[in-house]
From Swiss-Prot:
Recorded superkingdom: Eukaryota
Tissue: Expressed in pollen grains.
Start-end of DNA-binding region: 38-95
Organism: Arabidopsis thaliana (Mouse-ear cress)
Cross-referenced SMART domains: AP2
Gene that encodes it: ERF113
Record's subcellular location: Nucleus
Protein name: Ethylene-responsive transcription factor ERF113
Record-stated family: Belongs to the AP2/ERF transcription factor family. ERF subfamily.
Length: 212
């Protein structure tokens, strides 16, 4: 019995768990390597570089496109040649790069003056302009009638006409400030007094002047 135990100790066997771990370690490197993408018209040379070629549909012959450092560069060269030969019907390696996102239409550059007028806000309304009121038409007409009576030969009561003429109210010119209104009113009063004195003197001389 002792001899049998000694033989087992001298020749131990590997446990089954260790054997399965060794098998999984052997398959692990293959899983870590990324799968290479296959591109149209691209082949890898034995020395590692990538060659691109395309078939000309008109001549039915292969066209050499060149040798590139990476497979992506060779695939892009094939896409450019395929668009040249077949147009939009060509099957590409990177269709998203060629077509791209849908472009939105933009407004063309307008002249500077037009763009500024479009962007500038509307002008603000200015302050209300102060308009001066002219003498009433009735007052001007009365003055004209009075002048015509003086030049005519009709005998009228000038004193009565002048009293009724200047007793009528009239509007003074409006201005933006109260001071200007006061000065204008004073000037108008002075002019009115001068006219009354002149007309009274003229009426007095008219009646006292001896007639033939």
């Amino acid at each position: 019995m002792v001899s049998a135990l000694s033989r087992v100790i001298e020749n131990p066997t590997d446990p089954p768990v260790k054997q399965e771990l060794d098998k999984s370690d052997q398959h692990q490197p293959d899983q870590d390597q990324p799968r290479r993408r296959h591109y149209r018209g691209v082949r890898q040379r034995p020395w590692g570089k990538w060659a691109a070629e395309i078939r000309d549909p008109k001549k039915a012959a292969r066209v050499w496109l060149g040798t590139f450092e990476t497979a992506e560069e060779a695939a892009l060269a094939y896409d450019r040649a395929a668009l040249k030969f077949k147009g939009t019907k060509a099957k590409l390696n990177f269709p998203e790069r060629v077509q791209g996102p849908t472009t939105t239409t933009t407004i063309s550059h307008a002249p500077r003056g037009v763009s500024e007028s479009m962007n500038s806000p509307p002008p603000r309304p200015g302050p209300p302009s102060t308009t001066t009121t002219s003498w009433p038409m009735t007052y001007n007409q009365d003055i004209l009638q009075y002048a015509q009576l003086l030049t005519s030969n009709n005998e009228v009561d000038l004193s009565y006409y002048t009293s009724t003429l200047f007793s009528q109210p009239f509007s003074t010119p409006s201005s933006s400030s109260s001071s200007s209104q006061q000065t204008q009113q004073q000037q108008l009063q002075q002019q009115q007094q001068q006219r009354e004195e002149e007309e009274k003197n003229y009426g007095y001389n008219y009646y006292n002047y001896p007639r033939e």
